[in-house]
Design a protein with these regions (language model features):
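Conserved polymerase palm-domain catalytic core
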Residues: 24, 29, 37-38, 75-79, ...
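Active/ligand-binding-proximal structured segments within catalytic/core domains
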Residues: 60-68, 169-170
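Residues immediately flanking
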Residues: 7, 66, 110-112
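Charged boundary/loop elements
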Residues: 1, 66-82
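Residues forming anionic-ligand binding surfaces in small-molecule and nucleic-acid pockets
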Residues: 37-46, 68, 153-154
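Glycine-rich active-site/cofactor-binding loop and its immediate structural neighborhood
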Residues: 40, 44-53, 61
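Non-catalytic, polymerase-adjacent accessory regions of viral genome-replication enzymes
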Residues: 1-21
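Short glycine-rich loop/turn motifs
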Residues: 33-36, 49
Length: 204
């Protein structure tokens, strides 16, 4: 999606244009619709919808992400590995190995179908609970709509795959999943300790 244009038709910027864009960035609580682009899913005949923001919105999303990420990195569960700085799928594999190394365990391998597309906007915004201006801007991106074949459709749920801030928003939405599952595992502390939930984005 990096070299795909949004509704502004811009794919790349020169260094001079980037400097000019940075000087224009301002949190206004407004945004442009994303542009729908379909890309093939590896190993299947299905396609995945991307929502490509304008170049301006991409740059502003990077700024807002830089403001939010440190706070949430301090909160995120230690066994969450996807879309996080300094972490990779190899770290997730290592965590799985350590979890099953000394004792046989049942393993449930699952992923959340269409996770990005089904995130509840109100629940996510309530969870973020940041400064009003940032909150308004994030809500604007979530509600910006999507341009598909010349027609703009409303976005009532989800965060567009293709947005700079979307992976962080998805991780925020899924934060607390491990603790919630452990609450249903059993009443005793030992029963809860027996469960390891190792998550890489929407795969766990």
């Amino acid at each position: 999606g990096k070299r795909t244009a949004g509704v502004d038709g811009i794919k790349l910027l020169t260094p001079q244009q980037r400097i000019k864009l940075v000087n224009q960035l301002k949190i206004t609580g407004k945004s442009q619709p994303t542009r729908r682009v379909m890309i093939p899913k590896p190993g299947t005949n299905e396609s995945r919808p991307l929502g490509i923001p304008t170049m301006y919105d991409r740059a502003l999303q990077a700024v807002v992400k830089a403001a939010l990420e440190p706070e949430w990195e301090a909160k995120f569960e230690p066994n969450s590995y996807g879309f996080r700085p300094g972490r990779s799928c190899h770290d997730a594999i290592g965590a799985i190995f350590l979890s099953i190394r000394y004792k046989a365990k049942y393993v449930l391998d699952a992923d959340i179908a269409k996770c990005f597309d089904r995130i509840n906007h109100k629940a996510l915004l309530d969870k973020i609970n940041t400064y009003p201006r940032l909150q308004k801007q994030i809500k604007s991106w979530l509600k910006s709509g999507v341009l598909d074949q010349g027609e703009i459709f409303p976005t009532k749920e989800g965060t567009p795959q293709g947005g700079v801030i979307s992976p962080l928003l998805a991780n925020i939405a899924l934060h607390g999943m491990e603790e919630r599952i452990k609450q249903f595992a059993g009443k005793s502390i030992n029963q809860r300790r027996e469960i390891s939930l190792i998550r890489y984005a929407d795969d766990f």
